[in-house]
Amino acid sequence: MVGGNASGWIVGKEHYDLGNDLFTLMLDPYMQYSCGYWKDAATLEEAQEAKLQMICEKLQLQPGMRLLDIGCGWGGLSAYAAKNYGVSVVGVTISAEQQKLAQARCAGLDVQILLQDYRDLHQQFDRIVSVGMFEHVGPKNYRTYFNVVERNLAPHGLFLLHTIGSNKTDMNVDPWINKYIFPNGCLPSVRHIAEASEGHFVMEDWHNIGADYDRTLMAWFERFKQAWPQLAPRYSERFERMFSYYLNACTGAFRARCVSR
């Protein structure tokens, strides 16, 4: 994370540990807190399941493979891959709330959910995936990130990175988002990713679905508004205004194509 190991845990504590009730009500059943794939989808649920299927197919998952899910969130992708593709999954998160719910979601499946910094991993996996986590790594740690992925990936393995990206190479940190939503976050550019991964990987596929984030964020906002009466006893009106602004501001950025995915 931008400032080292400690700052990554700040993100987990301040945002992802807000409460599983908030995210359960706002997100789809797989609790995907990243862009859905709306090509043939009519609902948020369909868009997120289509995204999960696309990820698993790009990874060419086969029964018996070992899959590492870096930044596994609430375990939606880990559970989907284990259930539908017969793979053995290790998911890592730095959020205690996410780990708790992910373990419950993956009960009975060949899935292990670890509360651990990804940099401490020393295993071998046939496939590695990371969805919506690279935004928290920071430019100073991009090379380390790809070093860790390469170290844990078996020869001839595949790695899929799914991240929001900026159209310019800079310290792409929004002051408001950094203060209120994602402390220490930073959006990578194409150049950032290409330079940091050089010497580690051959880029076989580049797929930009950033335009789909507009609909995803609007779906989250509608669900957040509908759920607010249930959430209001626990969260303040200030939080409601802040979170609504966050979802709508991000929608505007994707709609204007200022950022991509």
Q: What is the role of each PLM region?
A:
Residues 1-26:
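N-terminal auxiliary segments of SAM/dcSAM-dependent transferases
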Residues 64-71:
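Conserved class I S-adenosyl-L-methionine
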Residues 74-85:
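Conserved SAM-binding loop of SAM-dependent methyltransferases across substrates and taxa
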Residues 108-118:
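Conserved SAM-binding strand-loop segment of SAM-dependent methyltransferases
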Residues 119-128:
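A short acidic, Gly/Pro-enriched loop at the edge of an enzyme's catalytic core
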Residues 143-155:
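A short glycine-rich, Lys/Arg-flanked "PGG" loop and its adjoining helix->strand segment in the class I
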Residues 156-164:
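Conserved beta-strand signature within the Rossmann-like core of class I S-adenosyl-L-methionine
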Residues 164-260:
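Substrate-binding/catalytic lobe of Class I Rossmann-like enzymes that use SAM or dcSAM, i.e.
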